[in-house]
């Protein structure tokens, strides 16, 4: 990951620059998808509530998403597949959907992933009545039918304790499925961290944790509500969420680190857990890039804004990111990040919601893109942010995925009648299918650089400029000859910049990174 930062001497010579065609600006809705890039889907009738919680992309451009359908007190796990145009795939499940019917109680689905052989696993909880929920993974064949060779009747279930247990994230390795869960103390409202691991066939891995699983917290009355988890570069597991402090009635972010065997990371925080008790807020999502961990959610207190923190795997702040490792953005009365991914250039893409707080507040889908240094991408949406409304009600984008065609698909819910599945697809750019090529050829190296930047070009280029991501011009000049030019950048602060070259074919841009 972070390829744009780690690869020295990025060579562009001989490569025809790809320019998006008109209407394909990064951060805009993809008009080739359904109704101008948007889809409201309610295939289970007007009385059903639908809510999409996670999504994966397949190689052919289709997507599969999971969530719940049904009525209050009787929600069922549902998995649906859409073709690249956004239509239900009739060859998947029954008319494009698999629904797990359980008459005992409601079920929940929060996370999904693809196994190496194309099977799909969905993590959540199966209800047995009252407060009895067991951590459950459903496994489907590529055609949307349960895998009879996985666990019992296509399900793996694990009971941590006698209370409510919900899998929040399924993490797939070459041989195992690791589940990150919230585990409640029976009879109490305290949450704890739960980890459990099984094979790709749904068999408990007895060598993980303590006989296959672990429940972990700081003490019996410390509430730790888990919301996400990721594998780290060292094979360990990072989890995040929020701690509810009953003394001041405030949530605070927390992170927990475990080794690959499911044991708390020695020397990290308090038994492998750090609570940011000086920073009110909540983590709902995380992503990793090399040895850097990114945690996202919202601030808490008088304002609730988009928030992302960057840390090293030892818990120290990754200071080159944003403002001393911390990013905040105030767009509306309430702003919340619910999912986070990192693209191949090291940029952060976050989905969530923005608008008026409260159950009936008018909120919109939100899609945010940051450069690797934690500044909003000025070439994306409006100052790095795009919002999309499905109507005058709340629209929450619970998850996103980047497709092989370099498009972002956001899934969630929209409360227009009852809650409906809400899906939107956006252009990220450049678009590989349907591009205009320019014959301008040049190279920029080394990139990143700590001192000088060389520009080699094959034709007459008239002007150049270096701007900050927010558009402030740092340097500018004229190019009066073809060949090569060297710029001294030792006086420019470390960070990401936009290099623009004026050519007979129009302006060409390239991100450059200065690292002193």
Question: Where are the regions that the model predicts?
Answer:
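Bacterial Sec-dependent N-terminal signal peptides
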Residues: 1-25
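C-terminal tail/sorting-segment detector
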Residues: 494-516
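Residue-level detector of functionally pivotal "anchor" positions at catalytic/ligand-binding pockets or at interdomain
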Residues: 427-445, 457
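Short strand-edge motifs at loop-to-beta-strand transitions and within beta-strands
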Residues: 483-487
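Extracytoplasmic mature domains of secreted or surface-exposed proteins
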Residues: 24-433
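Short beta-strand segments within Ig-like beta-sandwich modules, predominantly Fibronectin type-III
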Residues: 476-481
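Short, glycine-anchored, charge-dense loop/turn motifs used at functional sites
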Residues: 466-474, 497
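Short coil/turn motif common to extracellular beta-sandwich-like domains
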Residues: 447-453
């Amino acid at each position: 990951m972070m390829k744009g930062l780690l690869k020295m001497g990025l060579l562009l010579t001989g490569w025809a620059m790809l320019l998006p065609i008109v209407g394909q600006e990064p951060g805009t809705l993809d008009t080739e998808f359904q109704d101008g890039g948007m889809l409201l889907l309610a295939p289970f009738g007007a009385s059903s509530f639908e809510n999409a919680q996670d999504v994966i992309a397949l190689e052919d451009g289709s997507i599969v998403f999971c969530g719940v359908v049904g009525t209050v007190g009787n929600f069922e796990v549902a998995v649906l597949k859409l073709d690249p145009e956004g239509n239900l795939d009739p060859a998947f499940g029954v008319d494009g959907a698999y629904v797990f019917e359980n008459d005992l109680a409601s079920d929940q689905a929060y996370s999904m992933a693809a196994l190496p052989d194309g099977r799909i696993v969905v993590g959540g909880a199966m209800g047995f009545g009252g407060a009895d929920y067991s951590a459950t993974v459903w496994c489907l064949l590529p055609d949307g039918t349960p895998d009879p060779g996985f666990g019992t009747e296509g399900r793996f279930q694990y009971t941590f304790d006698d209370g409510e247990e919900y899998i929040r994230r399924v993490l797939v390795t070459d041989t195992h499925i690791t589940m990150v869960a919230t585990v409640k103390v029976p009879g109490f409202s305290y949450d704890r961290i739960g980890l459990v691991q099984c094979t790709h066939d749904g068999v408990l891995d007895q060598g993980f944790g303590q006989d296959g699983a672990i429940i972990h917290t700081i003490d019996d009355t410390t509430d730790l509500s888990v919301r996400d988890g990721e594998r780290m570069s060292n094979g360990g597991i990072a989890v995040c969420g929020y701690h509810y402090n009953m003394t001041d009635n405030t949530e605070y972010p927390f992170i927990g680190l475990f080794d690959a065997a499911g044991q708390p990371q020695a020397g990290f925080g308090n038994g492998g857990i750090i609570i940011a008790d000086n920073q009110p807020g909540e983590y709902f999502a995380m992503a990793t890039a090399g040895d850097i961990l990114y945690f996202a959610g919202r601030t808490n207190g008088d304002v609730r804004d988009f928030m992302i923190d960057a840390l090293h795997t030892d818990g120290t702040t990754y200071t080159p990111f944003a403002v001393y490792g911390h990013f905040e953005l105030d767009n509306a009365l309430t702003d919340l990040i619910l999912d986070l991914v990192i693209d191949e250039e090291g940029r952060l893409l976050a989905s969530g919601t923005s608008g008026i707080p409260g159950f009936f507040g008018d909120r919109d889908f939100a899609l945010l893109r940051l450069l690797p240094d934690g500044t909003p991408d000025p070439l994306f949406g409006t100052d790095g942010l795009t919002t999309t409304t499905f109507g005058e009600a709340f629209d929450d984008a619970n998850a996103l995925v980047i497709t092989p065609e370099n498009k972002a698909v956001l899934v969630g819910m929209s409360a227009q009648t009852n809650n409906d599945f809400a899906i939107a697809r956006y252009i990220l750019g450049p678009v590989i299918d349907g591009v205009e090529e320019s014959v301008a050829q040049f190279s920029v190296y080394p990139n990143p650089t700590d001192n000088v930047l060389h520009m080699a070009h094959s034709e007459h280029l008239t002007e150049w400029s270096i701007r900050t991501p927010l558009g402030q011009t740092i340097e500018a000049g004229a190019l009066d000859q073809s060949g090569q030019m060297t710029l001294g950048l030792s006086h420019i602060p470390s960070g990401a910049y936009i290099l623009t070259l004026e050519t007979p074919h129009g302006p060409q841009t390239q991100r450059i990174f200065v690292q002193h």
